[in-house]
C-alpha cells in the first residue's frame, strides 16, 4: 500500500494545473487599442524541443512586459500551464514604459530599447499561431495606413523561451520605413525588414507564410504545414524556403484565396524563380 501511495501521489502532483495565467485579461484598455499575449508552445516538458507542435494558442502574457528577463508562460502538451524560461531572446517585443503604449525590443543586455520600425523588431501582427521555426526579422508595411497590423517572426524552439510577444495596434500606424513604400513595385502590401533592407513578401518572409491585406487574424506557417488561418501551401514541385538559404519567388506569382475562413497562398511553380530581394 505504501508503494502505491509513493507512486500515485507524485503522479497526481505532476499533472496538477497551474492557474496563475489562466484568468489574466489579454485586452489592454489604454489609450491605444492593443492586445498583449504570448504565443504558447505545446511541447514535452522533458525535452521542450522534442514534441513541439505547429500550433500555438494565445492565452497568457508576460507578467511584466517591460522586463526583458521576466519569466513567460508555456502550455505543456498535457494541457496544464507552467512558468518556464527566464531570458527572452534578443529581439522580443517589449513595452518601453509601464502604462504607455510605446514598444521596443530586448537587446543583448536585457534592456528594452526603442528603435524606428525599419531597424527594430517591430510592432507585431495579431496572430493566433506561428511555426516552430522562424526568424527574428519583422514584417514591415509597404504603405502608410494599411488596415492590417504587422508581423514579427520568432524562433520558439524551446518551451519557456518561445519569444512571441505580440501586439495588435489598429490606431498608431506610423512606424514605417521611408523606403518601404517604394520597395515593392508589384503592389504587394507587405514586406520584410532583413539586414536593414525592405524585401518583398515573395522573398524571405514567405518561409513563414504571407501576410494578406484585409485579414485581421492570420497565422504563419513554415511552408510545410498549414495552420488554422493564413495557410502557406507549397505545391509538390515547389521549393520550400528554409532558415539557412534564401529562395525568392516573384510576388506576382502568388495567388491569394480568401473565403473568410482560410487564407491560402499557392505558389505558381510554372513561372521561373526570380530574385526580388534587392527590390
Curated annotation (Swiss-Prot):
Molecular-function GO terms, alphabetical: toxin activity
Signal sequence extent: 1-14
Domain of life: Eukaryota
Record-linked InterPro entries: Neurotoxin_TxP-I
Tissues expressing the protein: Posterior glands which appear to be connected with the stylet through a series of ducts.
Keyword Disulfide bond set for record: yes
Location of the protein in the cell: Secreted
Propeptide: 15-27
Keyword field: Disulfide bond, Neurotoxin, Secreted, Signal, Toxin
Record note on modification: Contains several disulfide bonds.
Chief site of localization: secreted
Gene Ontology CC: extracellular region
Function: Part of a complex mixture of neurotoxins which P.tritici utilizes to capture prey. It has contracting-paralyzing activity in insects.
The name this protein goes by in its record: Toxin TxP-I
Organism name: Pyemotes tritici (Straw itch mite)
Amino acid at each position: 500500500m505504501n508503494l502505491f501511495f509513493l507512486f500515485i501521489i507524485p503522479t497526481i502532483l505532476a499533472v496538477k494545473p497551474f492557474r496563475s495565467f489562466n484568468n489574466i485579461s489579454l485586452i489592454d484598455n489604454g489609450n491605444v487599442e492593443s492586445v498583449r499575449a504570448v504565443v504558447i508552445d505545446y511541447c514535452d516538458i522533458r525535452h521542450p524541443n522534442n514534441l513541439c507542435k505547429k500550433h500555438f494558442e494565445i492565452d497568457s502574457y508576460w507578467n511584466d512586459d517591460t522586463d526583458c528577463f521576466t519569466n513567460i508562460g508555456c502550455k505543456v502538451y498535457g494541457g496544464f500551464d507552467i512558468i518556464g524560461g527566464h531570458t527572452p531572446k534578443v529581439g522580443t517585443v517589449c513595452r518601453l514604459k509601464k502604462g504607455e503604449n510605446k514598444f521596443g525590443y530586448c537587446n543583448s543586455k536585457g534592456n528594452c530599447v526603442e528603435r524606428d520600425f525599419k531597424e527594430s523588431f517591430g510592432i507585431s501582427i495579431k496572430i493566433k499561431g506561428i511555426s516552430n521555426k522562424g526568424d527574428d526579422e519583422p514584417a514591415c508595411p509597404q504603405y502608410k495606413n494599411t488596415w492590417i497590423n504587422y508581423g514579427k517572426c520568432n524562433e520558439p524552439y524551446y518551451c519557456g523561451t518561445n519569444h512571441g510577444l505580440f501586439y495588435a495596434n489598429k490606431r498608431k500606424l506610423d512606424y514605417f520605413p521611408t523606403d518601404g513604400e517604394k520597395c515593392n513595385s508589384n503592389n504587394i502590401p507587405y514586406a520584410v525588414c532583413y539586414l536593414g533592407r525592405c524585401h518583398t513578401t515573395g522573398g524571405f518572409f514567405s518561409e513563414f507564410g504571407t501576410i494578406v491585406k484585409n485579414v485581421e487574424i492570420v497565422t504563419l506557417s513554415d511552408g510545410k504545414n498549414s495552420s488554422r488561418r493564413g495557410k502557406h501551401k507549397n505545391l509538390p514541385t515547389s521549393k520550400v524556403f528554409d532558415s539557412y538559404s534564401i529562395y525568392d519567388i516573384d510576388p506576382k506569382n502568388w495567388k491569394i484565396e480568401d473565403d473568410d475562413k482560410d487564407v491560402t497562398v499557392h505558389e505558381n511553380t510554372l513561372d521561373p524563380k526570380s530574385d526580388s530581394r534587392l527590390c
